């Protein structure tokens, strides 16, 4: 049995590590800022009962709240990123815990604010605005509070709910510990005779193997493991459904979906439009499954065949330096300024590039106001890693532009638009690579990568969205929600989405149990809507050039949360209140599918 040893962090060159010192030069400075934040939270609680006193008092409160947000963002990001670079360091585990405690303290200290602001009558507020031009800066923030008027409870009740926060997080925290630490998958023997334990990290790699018996072995190994724990995992999720139903009821929302979508001021019709439009295009996904079956040369297509390669990859490795150049070249349609900032970020401590022992898996972009964004990668010299770099730098550039052009009050863009900039970059990269590849086989390989991007993001996340909405509706109506009900629902959705050429294996009924996003309700649909908006923007940028780029950067990337997400996207040229962007994106999928069908005849 051979095993490649992961590098220790100190063995990796500093040029491939992020510079967290740009936030705090020393840990002592972080600790000092924690103390400042704690004291400021106490000061803010002293405003209780006085927000309606005068325009000056209300303004002072909002300014101090912004100051607290500034500290807390930095405190939380630094603690987590220090911990993520080496999760075995107990000092930084303690920092994460301290940051969480501070956040809860701040939440409790501010619990009085929204109910109190809601008690200020409209005439008095208008007189405050007349007295203070500075207070006008906070009008949108105040309007957002007023929008939640009928769903905000008394100060005492809000304080109780704030203190329930850690208890309410129990289903997610229990699932996270179970899924990341406790569940163990079996060992398998790979094609070279190595005995390897299946993990979350290598699961998809194994499912991407050309060896069908290995894929089947891994598939069954993972889902049989969840089956053993299925009663327990089901109860975790059912508890989450009960939580959501409780909070929706006490806050006087019609449903959990209405509650979660109200945070971003997203009409529920956007959710319904997505699922209905995806349903209308499912025949195209069924065609893709039929083509996959043909190209794999199998009598029956199974769920463990979804990631199997159907075209040989021509170039299997892309070094990190090659990836940086490729991404920068592909994003040239975004203009000189964008590319210049992008290149600078890739060279000046924004990115933690390579995997090391105990480093957090996956990839993300995260930053705090007042410092540059940070990107965590586990770069692996493959095509997926190149696209991940483009994706995460899309997030980072969005953060950079929003922070540069908005105050801290309105810099943080909302989840609904969070995946747009990242996926737009991926779309531009794919376009560039398809335009510049000369090898027909490489072109086919890239097309499968693009088509699978639609399958795993637009279609699959819509399937997730449909599952969690039906589950929440059942809970709200008082219908029985059990392990068997959830398993059957997930199985039926797989039959519907993948079509007649797919043999939907029994084991797939347990797949929903391994999806962490279900503990962040009504989140995943935004991957599908974001993907659709991104495809629309990339098309405009390539076809219209500078005018489209100027609107995209000036109105969207620089916009933060200065408008609600639908208005923000509309002002940049894409209207997500209609089914059109989703329909247009799925038409692009069908266009590429036709090209791929023709190329593989």
Enumerate the language-model features and the residues they cover.
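Short pre-active-site segment immediately N-terminal to the catalytic Zn-binding motif
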Residues: 316-318, 370-390
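Long, K/E/R/D-enriched contiguous segments that form extended
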Residues: 295-333, 339, 374, 398, ...
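A well-structured
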Residues: 1-313, 599-601
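Conserved helix-loop functional segments at active or binding sites
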Residues: 329-340, 366, 395, 399-407, ...
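Post-HEXXH active-site segment of zinc metalloproteases
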Residues: 388, 399-423
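Short beta-alpha connecting loops at secondary-structure transitions
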Residues: 374-378, 405-415, 444-453, 472-474
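Catalytic zinc-binding patch centered on the HExxH motif and its immediate surroundings
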Residues: 313-318, 351-371
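C-terminal, non-catalytic "cap/extension" segments appended to globular domains
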Residues: 11-12, 25, 113, 117-120, ...
């Amino acid at each position: 049995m051979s095993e490649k040893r992961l590098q220790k962090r100190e063995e990796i060159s500093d040029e491939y590590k992020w510079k967290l010192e740009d936030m705090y030069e020393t840990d002592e400075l972080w600790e000092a800022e924690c103390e400042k934040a704690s004291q400021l939270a106490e000061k803010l609680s002293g405003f209780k009962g006085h927000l309606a006193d005068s325009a000056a008092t209300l303004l002072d409160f909002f300014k101090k709240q912004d100051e607290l947000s500034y500290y807390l963002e930095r405190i939380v990001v630094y603690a987590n990123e220090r911990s993520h670079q080496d999760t075995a360091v107990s000092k930084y585990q303690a920092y994460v815990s301290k940051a969480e405690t501070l956040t809860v303290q701040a939440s409790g200290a501010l619990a009085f604010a929204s109910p109190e602001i809601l008690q200020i009558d409209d005439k008095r507020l208008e007189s405050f605005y007349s007295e203070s031009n500075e207070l006008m800066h906070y009008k949108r923030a105040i309007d957002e509070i007023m929008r939640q008027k009928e769903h905000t409870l008394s100060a005492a009740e809000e304080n109780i709910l704030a203190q329930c926060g850690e208890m309410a997080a129990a289903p997610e925290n229990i699932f996270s510990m179970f899924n990341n630490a406790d569940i163990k998958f079996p060992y398998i023997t790979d094609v070279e005779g190595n005995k390897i334990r299946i993990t979350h990290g290598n699961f998809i790699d194994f499912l991407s193997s050309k060896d069908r018996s290995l894929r089947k072995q891994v598939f069954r190994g993972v889902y049989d493991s969840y089956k053993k724990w299925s009663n327990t995992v089901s109860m975790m999720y059912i508890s989450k459904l009960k939580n959501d139903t409780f909070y929706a009821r006490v806050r006087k929302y019609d449903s959990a979906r209405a509650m979660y979508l109200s945070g971003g001021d997203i009409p529920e019709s956007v959710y319904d439009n997505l699922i209905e439009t995806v349903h209308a295009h499912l025949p195209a996904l069924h065609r893709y499954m039929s083509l996959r079956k043909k190209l794999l040369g199998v009598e029956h297509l199974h769920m463990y065949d979804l990631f199997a390669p159907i075209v040989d990859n021509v170039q299997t490795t892309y070094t990190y330096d090659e990836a940086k150049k490729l991404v920068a070249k592909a994003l040239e349609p975004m203009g000189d300024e964008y590319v210049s900032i992008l290149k600078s970020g890739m060279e000046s401590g924004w990115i933690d590039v390579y995997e090391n022992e105990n480093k957090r898996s996956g990839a993300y972009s995260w930053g705090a106001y007042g410092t540059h964004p940070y990107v965590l990668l586990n770069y692996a010299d493959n095509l997926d890693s190149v696209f991940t770099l483009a994706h995460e730098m899309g997030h980072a550039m969005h953060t950079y532009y929003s922070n540069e052009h908005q105050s801290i009050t309105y810099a943080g863009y909302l989840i609904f638009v969070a995946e747009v900039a990242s996926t737009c970059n991926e779309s531009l990269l794919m376009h560039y690579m398809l335009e510049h590849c000369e090898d027909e086989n490489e072109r086919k390989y890239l097309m499968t990568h693009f088509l699978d991007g639609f399958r795993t993001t637009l279609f699959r996340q819509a399937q997730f969205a449909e599952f969690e909405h039906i589950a929440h509706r059942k809970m709200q109506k008082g219908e029985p929600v059990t392990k068997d009900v959830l398993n059957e629902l997930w199985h039926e959705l797989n039959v519907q989405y993948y079509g007649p050429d797919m043999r939907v294996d029994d084991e797939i009924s347990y797949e929903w149990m391994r999806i962490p996003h279900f503990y962040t309700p009504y989140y995943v649909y935004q991957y599908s809507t974001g993907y659709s908006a991104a495809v629309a923007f990339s098309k405009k940028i390539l076809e219209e050039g500078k005018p489209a780029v100027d609107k995209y950067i000036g109105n969207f990337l620089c916009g933060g949360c200065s408008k609600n997400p639908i208005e923000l996207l509309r002002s940049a040229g894409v209207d997500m209140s209609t089914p059109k962007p989703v329909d247009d994106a799925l038409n692009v999928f069908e266009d590429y599918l036709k090209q791929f069908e023709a190329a593989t005849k």
